[in-house]
Amino acid sequence: MSKPAADDGYSAYEDSWRMGLLLVLGLLIFQAGALYGMGRTPICTCGYVKLWHGVVNSSENSQHIADWYTFSHIIHGFLFYALVRFLFPRSPIGLRLAFAVLIEGGWELLENSPFIIDRYRAGTISLDYYGDSIINSVSDTLAMVLGFVMARRLPIWVIVSLAILFELGTGYLIRDNLTLNVIMLLHPFEAIKQWQSGI
């Protein structure tokens, strides 16, 4: 005797999440392995791991689990959820999540390439930036996953409000955020760099 259609739908939904999470796990393992092959250190060279590191102009920035830039990666999750929902409206949610992780992981590998590291050091205030530790990079991707899940679960007005709050909050507290980061990476402005240096 076959199960009711509603049960079949719920089962397919669960299977989608399981498949997506397995793909996400595989992508995270690949990301960590690729970063190790690129010479990234597993943890901070200071020898310990902190849950939060809040000093931006520090050699330990982007070396621990979370920092001020974690909020930018959560916003990535908001944006990627909207993107994959637009591009693949009929695809299972698990596959959409895996695609978002693929994009984020690809950016993490690019961000830790010599070209982007040198670009950050030359065009932004990140003079002490020499690349992420592996634990920080993987944590950034998991922050994106958190943002993706939040975007799926919460009303759009909450997501938009949170994105604005994160951008304004980090902009005020550390004079940097996702918007400024993109601007300074693509086309550095000396006025912005000088303003950021005043922190």
UniProtKB/Swiss-Prot annotation:
Q: How does it sit in the membrane?
A: Multi-pass membrane protein
Q: Which GO terms describe its cellular component?
A: plasma membrane
Keywords (alphabetical) are:
Cell membrane, Membrane, Transmembrane, Transmembrane helix
Q: Which residues cross the membrane?
A: 19-39, 68-88, 154-174
Q: List the Pfam families hit by this protein, alphabetically.
A: DUF2585
Q: Where in the cell is it found?
A: Cell membrane
State the family it belongs to.
Belongs to the UPF0314 family.
Q: What is this protein called?
A: UPF0314 protein mll5005
